[in-house]
Amino acid sequence: MSRRNPCKYEIRGHCLNGKKCHFSHNYFEWPPHALLVRQNFMLNKILKSMDRSNDTLSEISGAAELDRTEEYALGVIGVLESYLGSVNNITKQSACVAMSKLLGEINSDDIKGLRNKELPTSPKIRIYNTVISYIDSNKRNPKQTIHLLKRLPADVLKKTIKNTIDIHNEINVNNPSDIGVNEQNE
């Protein structure tokens, strides 16, 4: 039995070099050390792919304490505006987590009220419907919503964040908080 070196280019049972590969693909010929290295490599790949899709708030995926301290210092809107303006080195991950929290704060009934005031041909109706769908998705599964937001291209994500902030501000102008109403009455 010939002792060729184990293939370094094999991933999930397929060699990236194709038929011209001169390394061994027979696992029974591989020394135990090479099998352990391959097993560790495969487990790390599985862990990374699972972490990205399921657990968006873990340390591995990047939403650890750093993002939470940014949010604590700047607030949810501050993090999103910093991401839009490309200041304070806000990552896409922290912007998506902050966006999810903002979507949780907005009431979809308020947006439906704004949408119903618009003309049927208004381009704002599509924006309102998009934000409403993100709010509904966020209520069902916030982690999946964060994952969906992270998969958006940067320019589309920035446009979505800007539209959501505009709608949030529009709702706050139309429906002032109870504290503001009490101050106006006095």
UniProtKB/Swiss-Prot annotation:
GO MF annotation list: RNA binding; structural molecule activity; zinc ion binding
Keyword terms: Activation of host NF-kappa-B by virus, Host cytoplasm, Host nucleus, Host-virus interaction, Metal-binding, Phosphoprotein, RNA-binding, Virion, Zinc, Zinc-finger
Domain of life per record: Viruses
Major localization class: virion
Site feature (Involved in RNA-binding) residues: 8, 23, 92, 151
Phosphoserine: modified positions: 58, 61
Known function: Essential for viral replication in vivo. Plays a role in the association of the matrix protein with the nucleocapsid, which initiates assembly and budding.
Protein family per UniProt: Belongs to the pneumoviridae M2-1 protein family.
Subunit relationships: Homotetramer. The homotetramer interacts with RNA. Interacts with the phosphoprotein (P); this interaction is required for protein M2-1 function, localization in host inclusion bodies. Interacts with the nucleoprotein (N). Interacts with the matrix protein (M); this interaction directs M localization to cytoplasmic inclusions comprising viral proteins L, N, P, and M2-1 and mediates M association with the nucleocapsid.
The protein, known as: Protein M2-1
Species for this entry: Ovine respiratory syncytial virus (strain WSU 83-1578)
Lineage, opening ranks: Viruses, Riboviria, Orthornavirae, Negarnaviricota, Haploviricotina
